[in-house]
């Protein structure tokens, strides 16, 4: 990941027999600097598809990882630490969602926002453990200040694909979030929503692939933006024809 000055940061997870460690390094003009540890734990959910990430800008850094919360295979929480540059120290770890339900929470995207805040978007499975019948995976987002305090939080979509990555980018007019939706007919196409003047737009399909699949393909979209230009890439396989759109 890079900050607005073009400095490149790399984060990764290493494991031994006892614990997992999240660390990062910054690329200097000569080499990668000495790795620095963000957090360690012996109860993390470590997975190839849903993994920790680092967000960096001039005001500091934010890092997240996934921590097992109960006995279910996919019962895990999103944990995060914040590094305000003016304090030059990591905050205590906190859980970014406040539902308190042991369910799947993950597939996070993080984006530097206004005045040192961070926009964090994630898949939230609280409704899959509640209601009769049980609900669906939801898409939620929140704004967090430099200390990690929650400033705002929203449900962006009440029914989305269960385990596809989310992605976000900052445009000239504000943030855009893209993700894989899930209709009642099991059509799982890519949708987008934008935060404009404090309100999220109604999610809309980027393209009507009409890919109907009764299961999660574990393959979300990726978005990038520069000024008013936005580019999104994603995988689709309607009629068993795989392609990148």
List each language-model region with its residue ranges:
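Extracellular, repeat-based ectodomains that mediate carbohydrate processing or recognition
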Residues: 1-245
């Amino acid at each position: 990941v890079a900050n607005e000055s073009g400095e490149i940061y790399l984060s990764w997870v290493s494991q031994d027999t006892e614990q997992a460690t999240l660390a990062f390094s910054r690329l200097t003009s000569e080499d990668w600097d000495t790795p620095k540890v963000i957090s360690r734990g012996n109860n993390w959910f470590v997975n190839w598809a849903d993994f920790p990430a680092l967000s960096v800008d001039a005001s500091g850094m934010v890092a997240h990882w996934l921590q097992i919360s109960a006995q279910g295979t996919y019962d895990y929480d999103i944990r995060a630490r914040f590094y305000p540059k003016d304090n030059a120290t990591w905050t205590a770890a906190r859980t970014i969602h406040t539902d308190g339900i042991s369910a799947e929470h993950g597939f996070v995207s993080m984006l530097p926002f206004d005045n040192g805040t961070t926009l964090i978007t994630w898949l939230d499975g609280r409704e899959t453990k509640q209601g009769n019948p049980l609900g669906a995976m939801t898409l939620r987002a929140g704004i967090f200040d430099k200390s990690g305090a929650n400033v705002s939080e929203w449900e962006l979509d009440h029914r989305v694909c269960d385990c596809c990555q989310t992605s976000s980018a900052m445009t000239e007019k504000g943030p855009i979030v893209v993700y894989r939706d899930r209709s009642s007919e099991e059509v799982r196409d890519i949708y987008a929503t934008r935060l404009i003047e404090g309100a999220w737009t109604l999610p809309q399909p980027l393209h009507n692939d009409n890919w109907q699949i009764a299961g999660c393909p574990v393959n979300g979209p990726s978005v990038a933006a520069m000024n008013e230009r936005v580019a999104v890439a994603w995988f689709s396989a309607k009629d068993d024809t795989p392609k990148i759109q």
